[in-house]
């Protein structure tokens, strides 16, 4: 394996970390609520803190990579994530978990912006599309695995069968007995340290941003924001990410409150299959988009998503579980299609427009917060 292929492998590992850390919050949310005795409104501040960071950091991250390059930017991103996770390990309280999630969110937002051009430079233009699909598969696999890892860890930490498991006994020793889920933050801290060490020793190729990847000037943003379609596509990204995270964060708690489903059992499994079916939908979407018009595909999948959600909200237990999971498939193509349609709607300033659209990931903070408030 040549040197650049090792870098591509490292980037895929970073995608795995981003996905696992980002999407573990949903299945963990009922446990956090129970541990801290939170109201749903206070609980809603948890995903709000994390995705608020995405909204704040998306545009500055592009400027940071232009100024400092890929390697330094990666080190900054993982340092922020390390500080966030480490802070909660030391001070496991509700106010600190909000601060921790915000800091980790800043790091994850930076990473997503940095590794796209880095993947292109390391893997080459010819393999870029293939590597992006591979990254999407890795991202989906991590999302699918995270609820199962959480459920398995909770069974070990709260059970009596861990006497011969050194690592579990070690986690029990450093984790507050009433907060077994917080052991994941210790694991995240270790992972972030490992990534910092590895990245510090790796020589990355110089990242030359294309014009459509550069952050752009203030004037570029002003010019874009005067255009009606830019605002509509921005709102579309807010709506999509808000729907995705609203479902992922609240479905387990919904199933627990209205159907008595265990968050560590069927609730976690439902969240896992939500992400798993989303990944399958993304792969099928690569084929379907070649056969039918993107706008038509978006309309069809949107109608299926509305139907799935209605069944999930009002159906009996087993039907609701299946419908919530199927929501992942029905919204799977929306982000990529909306993003592509948006960029194709303008003939210049694509880098600045991408920054505006990525800021719309703030919808992952806004919509779940509204759901919690309701």
Q: Which residues are covered by each model-predicted region?
A:
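Extracytoplasmic
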Residues: 6-40, 58-61, 116, 146, ...
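Extracytoplasmic gate region of multi-pass secondary transporters
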Residues: 25-26, 146-147, 154-155, 222-273
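Helix-breaking motifs and short loop linkers at transmembrane-helix boundaries and internal kinks
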Residues: 37, 69, 90-95, 314-316, ...
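Central cavity-lining transmembrane alpha-helices of secondary-active solute carriers
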Residues: 45-63, 272-284, 363
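Conserved MFS/SLC helix-loop-helix module at the cytosolic interface between two early adjacent transmembrane helices
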Residues: 56-95
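Intracellular juxtamembrane helix-capping segments at the cytosolic ends
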Residues: 110-124, 332-347
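Glycine-rich segments within core transmembrane alpha-helices of 12-TM secondary carriers
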Residues: 127-161, 355-368
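C-terminal membrane-cytosol helix-exit motif in multi-pass small-molecule transporters
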Residues: 150-162, 176, 186-211
């Amino acid at each position: 394996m040549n040197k650049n292929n090792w870098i591509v492998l490292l980037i895929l590992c970073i995608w795995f970390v981003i996905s696992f850390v980002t999407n573990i919050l949903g299945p963990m949310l009922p446990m956090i609520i129970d541990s801290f005795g939170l109201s749903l409104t206070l609980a809603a501040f948890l995903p709000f803190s994390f995705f608020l960071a995405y909204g704040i950091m998306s545009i500055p991250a592009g400027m940071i990579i232009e100024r400092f390059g890929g390697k330094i930017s990666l080190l900054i991103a993982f340092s922020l994530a390390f500080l966030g996770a480490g802070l909660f390990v030391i001070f496991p309280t509700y106010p600190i978990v909000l601060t921790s999630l915000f800091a980790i969110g800043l790091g994850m937002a930076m990473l997503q912006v940095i590794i796209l051009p880095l993947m292109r430079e390391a893997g080459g233009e010819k393999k870029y599309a293939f590597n992006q699909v591979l990254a999407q598969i890795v991202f989906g696999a991590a999302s699918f695995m995270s609820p199962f890892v959480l459920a398995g860890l909770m069974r070990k930490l709260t059970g009596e069968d861990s006497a011969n498991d050194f690592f579990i006994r070690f986690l029990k020793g450093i984790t507050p007995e009433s907060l077994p889920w917080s052991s994941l933050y210790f694991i995240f801290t270790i992972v972030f340290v490992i990534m910092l060490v590895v990245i510090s020793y790796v020589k990355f190729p110089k990242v030359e941003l294309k014009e459509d990847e550069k952050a752009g000037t203030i004037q570029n943003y002003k010019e874009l924001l005067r255009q009606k379609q830019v605002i509509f596509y921005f709102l579309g990204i807010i709506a999509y990410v808000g729907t995705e995270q609203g479902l992922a964060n609240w479905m387990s708690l919904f199933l627990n409150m209205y159907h008595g489903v265990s968050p560590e059992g069927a609730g976690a499994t439902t969240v896992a299959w939500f992400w798993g079916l989303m990944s399958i939908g993304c792969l099928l979407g690569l084929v379907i988009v070649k056969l039918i018009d993107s706008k038509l595909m978006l309309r069809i999948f949107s109608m299926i998503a509305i139907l799935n959600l209605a069944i999930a909200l009002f159906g009996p237990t087993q039907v609701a579980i299946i419908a919530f999971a199927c929501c992942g498939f029905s919204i799977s193509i929306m982000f990529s299609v909306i993003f592509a349609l948006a960029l194709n709607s303008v003939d210049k300033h694509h880098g600045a427009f991408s920054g505006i659209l990525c800021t719309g990931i703030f919808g992952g903070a806004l919509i779940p917060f509204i759901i919690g408030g309701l």
